[in-house]
């Protein structure tokens, strides 16, 4: 038996960060290859992105190789291909995964603002990005060169940069010199002089070789030295001319020292004496001195003592010039012990005199072109270079080269390097202490290497996502929480550091609370979404079209596989880094490709396809209008629907619509089939036959269709669906043709016309849906608009003209006396007969007998009026009235109020029939002759042009400025236009049956403005303008009539009937185009407004019948700048009283004398009640003297003071029970009192009441009179005052329901004038009611007629936008902690902060205007007026708290701070402004709708002091949550003592960490410890306010110290902000900034309780409003009546 039940299945949804294990658990297998589909077989590749083994079979119940086919094998895993046999639906659900070769950071957590990773790790986003993407840091630093390594691993000449040097320096001892980097050395090295080359090499201080090329230009004196001479100079010694080079000497003869043989060597000029073989003597060598003779021959034997040579003398050789001694290259000498040299053979000694010398040092590695002794010419090449580019020189080396090559090269003292950075992930505590480094610090790779050398294996640093992962794994969140809390205690709460810390603390707490692990923000595994959600489709030409996601996945897999391969090969680090970075970028692109539109900079390259279009990533699939949320979850397509053009259906009833037969057959096909099948058997062949019957359109099919349709309803919808009346239910009637027929009266709610509009039809399928549609949505029950409570389904155009024509009369009718009437009838039937027989016409005056209020009367009327009144309810008939549009509307409304909705619906049908009929009969036509031009027009124009000429003359003579001239002309033409308009109207009215007059006058079409342009004068034209233009801005600031800047001062003085000339035509085009453009521009804007409104208010439903509050808002006329925006009766209509309404005089509950209704608390006010209460006023005494009997058990029911002293109470004290007690103690029974009946009433006269002198206003309209004011009245001798009762009505603003509003505070459901039902979606209704007319609120800046003030420019939508987004127009700039308002329109309005009087308005020394206000106590308050503002008050005027003293924009937060908790004053001010915008456009919307939106805008508060909550100062928190939290704290604080007893003996569920006074973290207790009294005492002393203990395997938190409540300030949010701060994350994510909302929610592990409507639509269940409420959940609806009977039988 088919049944449908409305159980809501999902209670709440939680979002968390997925851990790698969770992702793997979702997966059906790892995707290892980037392949998708085999291009030949079109089958998915194994292990690829579409693999059947991982994701499920492509064909239903068939494995890949085809071994198993059919449902019987369901669940079998094929052993050949590994595919599980199941439904192909699995490919929509089963996921895969990719194991990453290196971790990758999830971009949402990095790029969110503020960055989650950044906040948690306390790092800046740029540093994080640098680490994740292997970035580098640019370092400008000095370099050093090691000159002496000592006991370090360095070598001499190693270059060390400053950063490393500082690190090494602390631990090691070695010597360095600063290094200089050589730049632009000039080459080659050229000789500057002619000369001889000498080469010399030496080692520098850094152990490198320097070759010295020395070129000398010299004169040389040669001196020959002979053997035996003794040289007394050294090589290189300086000598003077004539100085001895050798000694002068006499050489003795040589004698043989022993016996032996002589050997003479003439070549070397020596004699060798060899001893005899028997001797032990050694051989001796003698040099033969120059000039000595040898006395022996070669080989001769000599005896000891024989003379061998003769003696000789050698002269001294003297230097012939001064200079340097140089030994010749052939000089053979022997060094002697005294430092001189003995010459062994003849040679040369030179004395060189250097004329010029040049030294050229050359660094090692340079190529030297010359050798020692080479002669070079000036300009010859000596070497290819002296230094290399980028060579590092030590300071000493630099000095050498600098002195020899002063301008030949540059140096840099500091070098600029890009250093890869790494982050420390692990460090030995001692090393940390020593170096000051900690985990999470960023160092360059060079620094890291330095630390590693000093502390091997004690420090670890890394870059890339793996480093971030390690850091996150290292976080001890509990310790971190204790640390931050301890640090916060030391800081002032408003400091920026504290705010930053609090943000971090909140995040830490979120992670702890949600159970998310921080390292999960770094992905090891990437999930692959099911293939059917990213399909590949074959397109013609054999190619494949695929989703961007596949391309992103492919890139990711390719990079991942390449990285795996490189890791296996052991590739160098630099290649791996690059590959890892690319992998990270691939993961980023998959999750969020592209720089974000939300104003974030992105360092990543956007991945694009062939056409350069960015690929759509997962984030793009969620966000925006085309995203998953708004496109698919909130905007689903509906089956069983059709769409067609609409045409008018004049013979339909109001609840019917015509559906084309073909369409109906298609829509109801299943029902028709079922009906046909129900008769015969249900075999397959029968099915086919029946289907054929339908498809071949056989007659029996149509019969069955007629039967099926009977009693069912369909829904009709016209886009755009701006409010709920855009979808209504109708009973379908089958019609021929292809168009849907629509009843003409329901056009206004649909905003439909028949110029080609289309409408959609939907069929509610289940019985429950049918019932809902029929009883709640049927068009006859939706005549009344929920926006304002008046009818909205109304007759228009032809129907109105028909009714008007029927009831109108000729000119002579009113003047005709009854006795002159020719025709008299006894009954309407008789009159009709006369009409049909042609005796009378519809408009012939007749006398006729009709029943009026139950009695027969003879009246003068016309047959038309009799016919029309025939269809009206008897008590509403009026035979002497013309029924135009207004009258008909009032008639329908009155019928609804008196006789209910059904009678009203029938009346609409009757009016439609009669209207159409008589519109046809009337033969209404239009011709040019009907446009009557007023004869006086030409004369008026002539005079006007004359006046214009005079103005122009005055201007030319200089009597008027340009501004004044323009202004005068415009005013003149405006008044003329108005005059001609009146004349045109008058001229037309001369013939009541003039078709144009009838159309305009009846309200059927057109207005007098259009007629004026056709037959009168077009008048002044508007310019198109740019609101940002300087002219316009300056006008606004000066507060001038803005329209003057926007108007041509040359009028179109012709009308369209006679035609305009070329110039005037061109002037007209401006305005025409502006209208078009404005409309186009504002439609989308209005749509966005509606969307924001709905988002803000969607969760407001009627939650309970009564919240029980006694609060409310005061009923009053809404007055904005002197104009009444809304009268009090409209304000009261549909509301519920919050308190009894008391008669101002008697103070008893007020009673309506006509109906006898008493106005007590919780009474709902109808139209009549509202009119009665709004008009009820009385003259009441200000004061009365009475003597009262104090033995009675009640005080007087009005404010009273004692008129004589009683006990210690002085005269004038308020009469209370204490005073009476004192009187009784004195033995009195009666005391004299002054009673003030006016206290607590409201002043009801529009003219203010002045004091005796007439200088001061004592009372202003609508002021509530208190005792202070009453005494002032008394002092000024005022005896009686006209007052009305103080009426407090309930309002959504003051409702105390936790969610939504209660029925009593909302009041009447305007669409049926009954109290609203629980579950009604009042928020959405409110949003629609405000948004729907938005399109009408286009910038109608130019109202022709009446001079407009500056307030007009900001008309319409701009005003609405300004009110709902109050901060978009006021830029708050914080300077020095003070908020300053930058003006948008004019300046800021000054608010009065007290009740009082304007004492004076004066100017101070600086020339600024100051307003002095005196309050009731006589204190003076001064307010300085900003330069551009206008003073809005005058001396002696009474002002009340919160009123504006000057022109300008109200700064809402200032107003909010002025008032009490409720925010009512702010809301009422907003209401005035916004109502004004709508009223000007003639749009009526009930206040309660605005109040609901304002309630939502005021629903948040800013935390001033978070107390013991997890909130941060300045955080926005729903008021409900704050109040709940504070309530819980008060309850919790009461239980502290009890809890302390309870926890003794329990086991701790979490460890307890606290900070000592020295700032160290200590652990007080471990998890699992037992709580003893001693431990508890310690915990309490440490200031820990709650502990977690185990109770029956559950963790329970106990509060053991009192907590601080939250202090807060009410905030007025803009619509957008209010929607984004919505507590449920699903709805907020669907609104805007999807990624950020989801990120924040995932971290918190946020639970969406699915309270609002949107969330439930998103998860696909009934909304918790109306029949979707849990109250109705148990109801089961029988689909077929038979089933119940069967059940009984069973």
Swiss-Prot record:
Taxonomy, superkingdom: Bacteria
Record has Plastid as a keyword: no
Signal peptide coordinates: none
Binding-site residues, Zn(2+) 1: 63, 65, 78, 81
Chain sites annotated for binding Zn(2+) 2: 1107, 1295, 1302, 1305
Keywords in alphabetical order: DNA-directed RNA polymerase, Magnesium, Metal-binding, Nucleotidyltransferase, Transcription, Transferase, Zinc
Its biological purpose: DNA-dependent RNA polymerase catalyzes the transcription of DNA into RNA using the four ribonucleoside triphosphates as substrates.
Quaternary structure annotation from Swiss-Prot or TrEMBL: The RNAP catalytic core consists of 2 alpha, 1 beta, 1 beta' and 1 omega subunit. When a sigma factor is associated with the core the holoenzyme is formed, which can initiate transcription.
Family: Belongs to the RNA polymerase beta' chain family.
Protein's UniProt name: DNA-directed RNA polymerase subunit beta'
């Amino acid at each position: 038996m088919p049944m449908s039940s409305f159980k809501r299945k999902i209670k709440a949804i939680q979002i968390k960060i997925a851990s790698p294990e969770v992702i793997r658990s979702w997966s059906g297998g790892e995707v290892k290859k980037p392949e998708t589909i085999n291009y030949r077989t079109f089958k998915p590749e194994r292990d690829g992105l579409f693999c059947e083994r991982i994701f499920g079979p492509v064909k239903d119940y068939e494995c890949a190789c085809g071994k198993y086919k059919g449902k019987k094998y369901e669940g079998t895993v094929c052993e050949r291909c590994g595919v599980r046999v199941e439904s192909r639906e699995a490919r929509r659900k089963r996921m895969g995964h990719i194991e990453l070769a290196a971790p990758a950071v999830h971009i949402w957590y990095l790029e969110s603002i503020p960055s989650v990773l950044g906040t948690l790790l306390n790092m800046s986003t740029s540093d994080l990005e640098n680490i994740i993407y292997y970035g580098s840091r640019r370092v400008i630093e000095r370099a050093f060169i090691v000159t002496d390594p000592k006991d370090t691993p360095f070598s001499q000449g190693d270059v060390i940069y400053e950063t490393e040097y500082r690190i090494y320096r602390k631990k090691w001892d070695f010597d360095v010199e600063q290094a200089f980097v050589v730049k632009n050395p000039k080459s080659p090295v050229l000789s500057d002089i002619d000369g001889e080359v000498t080469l010399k090499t030496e080692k520098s201080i850094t152990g490198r070789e320097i070759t010295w090329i020395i070129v000398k230009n010299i004169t040389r004196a040669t001196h020959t030295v002979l053997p035996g001479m003794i040289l007394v100079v050294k090589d290189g010694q300086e000598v003077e001319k004539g100085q001895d080079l050798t000694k002068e000497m006499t050489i003795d003869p040589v004698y043989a020292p022993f016996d032996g043989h002589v050997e003479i060597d003439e070549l070397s000029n020596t004699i060798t004496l060899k001893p005899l073989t028997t001797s032990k003597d050694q051989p001796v060598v003698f040099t033969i001195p120059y000039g000595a003779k040898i006395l022996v021959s070669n080989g001769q034997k000599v005896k000891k003592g024989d003379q061998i040579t003769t003696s000789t003398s050698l002269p001294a050789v003297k230097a012939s010039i001064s200079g340097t001694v140089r030994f010749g290259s052939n000089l053979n000498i022997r060094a002697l012990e005294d430092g001189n040299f003995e010459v062994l053979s003849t040679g040369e000694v030179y004395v060189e005199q250097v004329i010029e010398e040049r030294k050229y040092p050359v660094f090692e590695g340079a190529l030297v072109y010359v050798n020692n002794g080479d002669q070079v010419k000036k300009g010859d090449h000596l070497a290819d270079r002296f230094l290399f580019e980028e060579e590092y020189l030590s300071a000493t080396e630099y000095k050498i080269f600098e002195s020899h090559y002063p301008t030949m090269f540059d140096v840099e003292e500091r070098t600029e390097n890009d250093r890869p950075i790494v982050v420390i992930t692990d460090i030995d505590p001692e090393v940390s202490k020593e170096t000051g480094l900690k985990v999470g610090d960023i160092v360059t790779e060079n620094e890291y290497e330095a630390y590693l050398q000093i502390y091997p294996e004690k420090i670890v640093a890394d870059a890339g996502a793996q480093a971030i992962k390690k850091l996150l794994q290292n976080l001890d969140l509990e310790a971190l929480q204790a640390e931050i809390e301890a640090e916060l205690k030391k800081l002032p709460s408003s400091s920026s550091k504290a705010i930053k810390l609090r943000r971090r603390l909140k995040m830490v707490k979120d992670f702890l609370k949600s159970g998310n692990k921080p390292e999960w923000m770094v992905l090891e595994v990437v999930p692959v979404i099911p293939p059917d959600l990213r399909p590949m489709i074959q397109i013609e030409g054999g190619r494949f079209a695929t989703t961007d996601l596949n391309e992103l996945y492919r890139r990711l897999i390719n990079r991942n596989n390449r990285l795996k391969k490189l890791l296996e090969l052991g590739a160098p680090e630099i290649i791996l880094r690059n590959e890892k970075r690319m992998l990270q970028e691939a993961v980023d692109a998959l999750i969020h490709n592209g720089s974000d539109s939300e104003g974030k900079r992105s360092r990543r390259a956007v991945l694009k396809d062939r056409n350069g279009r960015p690929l759509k990533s997962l984030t793009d699939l969620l966000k925006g209008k085309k995203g998953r949320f708004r496109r698919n979850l909130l905007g689903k397509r509906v089956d069983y629907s059709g769409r067609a053009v609409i045409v008018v259906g004049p013979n339909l009833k109001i609840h019917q619509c015509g559906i084309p037969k073909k369409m109906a057959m298609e829509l109801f096909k299943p029902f028709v089939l079922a009906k046909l099948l129900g008769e015969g058997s249900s075999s397959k062949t029968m099915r086919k036959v029946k289907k054929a019957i339908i498809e071949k359109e056989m007659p029996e099919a149509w019969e069955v269709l007629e039967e099926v349709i009977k009693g069912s309803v369909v829904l009709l919808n016209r886009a755009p669906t701006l409010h709920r009346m855009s979808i209504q239910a109708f009973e379908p009637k089958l019609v021929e043709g292809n168009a849907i027929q629509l009843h003409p009266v329901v056009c206004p709610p649909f905003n439909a016309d028949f110029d080609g509009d289309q409408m959609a039809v939907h069929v509610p399928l289940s019985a429950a849906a049918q019932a809902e549609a029929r009883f709640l949505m049927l068009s006859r029950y939706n005549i009344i608009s929920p926006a304002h409570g008046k009818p909205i389904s109304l007759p228009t155009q032809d129907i109105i003209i028909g009714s008007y024509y029927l009831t109108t009369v000729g000119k002579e009718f009113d003047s005709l006396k009854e006795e002159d009437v020719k025709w008299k009838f006894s009954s309407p039937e008789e009159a009709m007969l006369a009409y049909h027989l042609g005796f009378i016409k519809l408009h012939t005056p007749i006398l006729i007998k009709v029943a009026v209020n139950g009695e027969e009367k003879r009246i003068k009327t016309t047959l038309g009026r009799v016919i029309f009144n025939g269809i009206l309810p008897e008590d509403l008939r009026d035979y002497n009235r013309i029924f135009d549009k207004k009258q008909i509307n009032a008639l329908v409304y009155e019928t609804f109020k008196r006789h209910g909705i059904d009678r009203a619906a029938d009346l609409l049908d009757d009016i439609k029939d009669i209207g159409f009929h008589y519109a046809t009969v009337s033969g209404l036509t239009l011709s040019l002759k009907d446009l009557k031009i007023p004869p006086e027009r030409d004369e008026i124009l002539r005079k006007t042009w004359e006046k214009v000429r005079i103005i122009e003359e005055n201007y030319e003579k200089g009597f008027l400025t340009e501004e004044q001239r323009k202004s005068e002309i415009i005013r003149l033409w405006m008044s003329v236009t108005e005059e001609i308009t009146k004349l045109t109207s008058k001229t037309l009215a001369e013939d009541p049956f003039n078709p144009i007059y009838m159309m305009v006058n009846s309200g059927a079409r057109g207005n007098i403005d259009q007629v004026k342009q056709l037959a009168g004068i077009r008048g002044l034209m508007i310019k198109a303008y740019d609101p940002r233009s300087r002219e316009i801005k300056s006008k606004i600031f000066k507060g001038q009539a803005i329209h003057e800047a926007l108007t041509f001062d040359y009028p179109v003085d012709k009308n369209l009937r006679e035609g305009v000339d070329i110039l005037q035509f061109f002037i007209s085009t401006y305005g025409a185009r502006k209208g078009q453009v404005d409309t186009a521009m504002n439609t989308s804007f209005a749509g966005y407004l509606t969307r924001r409104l709905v988002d803000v208010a969607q969760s407001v439903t009627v939650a309970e019948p009564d919240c029980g509050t006694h609060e409310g808002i005061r009923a009053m006329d809404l007055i904005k700048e002197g104009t009444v925006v809304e009268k009090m009766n409209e304000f009261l209509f549909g509301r519920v009283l919050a308190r009894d309404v008391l008669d101002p005089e008697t103070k008893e509950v007020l009673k309506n004398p006509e109906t006898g209704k008493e106005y007590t608390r919780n009474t709902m006010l109808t139209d009549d009640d509202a009119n009665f209460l709004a008009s009820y006023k009385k003259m009441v005494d200000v004061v009365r003297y009475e003597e009262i009997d104090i033995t009675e058990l009640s005080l007087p029911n009005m404010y009273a003071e004692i008129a004589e002293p009683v006990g210690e109470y002085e005269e004038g004290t308020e009469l209370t029970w204490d005073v009476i007690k004192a009187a009784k103690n004195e033995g009195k029974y009666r005391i004299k009192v002054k009673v003030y009946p006016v206290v607590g009433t409201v002043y009801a006269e529009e003219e203010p009441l002045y004091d005796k002198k007439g200088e001061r206003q004592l009372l202003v309209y609508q002021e509530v009179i208190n005792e202070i004011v009453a005494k002032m009245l008394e002092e000024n001798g005022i005896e009686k005052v006209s007052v009305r009762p103080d009426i407090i009505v309930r309002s959504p603003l003051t409702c105390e329901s936790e969610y939504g509003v209660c029925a009593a505070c909302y009041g009447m459901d305007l669409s049926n004038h009954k109290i609203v039902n629980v579950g009604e979606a009042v928020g959405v209704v409110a949003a629609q009611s405000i948004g729907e007319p938005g399109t009408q609120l286009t910038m109608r800046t130019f109202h022709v007629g009446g001079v407009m003030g500056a307030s007009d420019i900001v008309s319409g939508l701009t005003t609405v936008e300004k009110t709902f987004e109050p901060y978009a127009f006021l830029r708050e700039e914080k300077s020095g902690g003070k908020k300053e308002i930058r003006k948008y329109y004019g300046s800021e309005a000054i608010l009065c902060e007290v009740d009082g009087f304007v004492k004076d308005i004066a100017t101070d020394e600086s020339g600024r205007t100051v307003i002095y206000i005196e309050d009731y106590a006589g204190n003076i308050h001064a307010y300085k007026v900003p330069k551009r503002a206008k003073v809005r008050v005058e001396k002696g005027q009474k002002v009340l708290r919160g009123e504006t003293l000057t022109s300008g924009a109200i700064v809402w937060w200032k107003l909010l701070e002025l008032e009490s908790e409720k925010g009512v004053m702010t809301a009422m001010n907003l209401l005035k402004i916004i109502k004004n915008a709508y009223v000007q456009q003639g749009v009526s919307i009930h206040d309660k709708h605005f109040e609901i939106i304002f309630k939502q805008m005021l629903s948040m508060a800013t935390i001033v002091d978070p107390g013991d909550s997890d909130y941060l100062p300045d955080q926005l928190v729903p008021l409900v949550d704050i109040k709940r939290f504070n309530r819980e704290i008060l309850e919790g604080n009461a239980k502290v003592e009890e809890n302390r007893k309870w926890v003794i003996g329990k086991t701790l569920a979490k460890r307890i960490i606290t900070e000592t006074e020295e700032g160290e973290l200590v652990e007080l207790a471990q998890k699992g410890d037992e709580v003893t009294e001693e431990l508890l005492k310690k915990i309490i002393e440490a200031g820990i306010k709650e502990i977690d203990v185990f109770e029956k395997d559950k963790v329970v938190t106990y509060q053991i110290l009192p907590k601080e409540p939250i202090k807060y300030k009410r905030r007025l949010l803009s619509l957008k902000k209010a929607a984004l701060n919505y507590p449920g994350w699903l709805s907020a994510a669907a609104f805007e900034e999807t990624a950020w909302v989801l990120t924040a929610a995932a971290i918190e592990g946020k639970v969406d309780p699915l309270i609002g409507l949107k969330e439930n639509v998103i998860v696909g269940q009934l909304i918790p409003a109306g029949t979707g409420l849990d109250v109705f959940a148990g109801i089961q609806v029988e689909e077929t009546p038979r089933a119940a009977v069967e059940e009984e039988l069973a």
